[in-house]
Amino acid sequence: MTKRNPTLRQKEGRNMDNRIQLLEQHYGACAKRPDLYGIIIPGKRGRLLSVLYTAEGDGVHPTVILLHGIPGCEQNFDLAQALRRVGFHVLTFHYSGNWGSDGNYSLRNDLEDAQTVLDFVLSDGTYGFDKNRIYAVGHSLGGFVCGQLTARPEIKGGVLLMPCDIGRIRQISLQSEETAAGIRDVLEDSAHWLNGVTGEALLREAEEYSRQLCLESAARPLAKKPLLCITGTLDTCTPGRYHCSPLMDAIRAEGGRLLKSLEFPTDHFFSDYRLTVAACVTEFLEELAGIRPPARGSGTESACSHSIS
């Protein structure tokens, strides 16, 4: 076995230390360290199991409600950590009938649960939520929930990551049966993790309540909000042209001018773009929250700026 050069090993160690120092701040035994809490939020169907990442420091903090998809195998905790590092509280939760939360699962229950969690944030006096700086971030079916939740006036901006516009399943079937079949397969597979529902029942609900569930139904209030939509050219689950573009067009038709869209050569879970997507999301929300000044005109160029359309 070839021995590694000790000088090279030391150099690699120093490089690692430098990267850690750039990315991570160590707080030691300060009075208000970053922390993590498991929270049970009372919902209309019982307990909503939630996790809260709190940022360092006294006082209130800008807050992100992070919404996972269906069934939620990808919960984007790395994104939660990235947002906390720059000063956000991040609250994520499991929908009714999902991953231990009480009740039965349904698409309309997802929307109601998100409203319940937002109301919890607005009424809480314990954890230091800044009630004037609340944002929503959602991935996949969580992007659908995020879009609907961001219509609430208390939400100041939103981020949709590979969103699933579940209310458009019928229209998508007319445009691409292959894409629609993929959504049906996801619903069927996801039902194994969900209480009180089948894939067929979810599909029926999506079609029966399509007008209420489609993201375009929220276009008018969303036209007044800063919104970032990130899609992937290799995403075969929720291709942006079927799931994101119709919402963007509807918002623009309502006069919306606060949209940003990004597209990367990656899959539905942005598996090889995790750090890039996290950087783009944090940069977008930092600017909205006033944590950092706008990048425009600074003389430096964001890694996220190249793909903005």
Residue ranges and their predicted role:
Residues 123-127, 131-180:
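Primarily recognizes the serine-hydrolase "nucleophile elbow" in alpha/beta-hydrolase
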Residues 71, 98-131:
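Catalytic nucleophile-loop/oxyanion-hole region of alpha/beta-hydrolase
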Residues 69-81:
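The serine-hydrolase catalytic nucleophile loop
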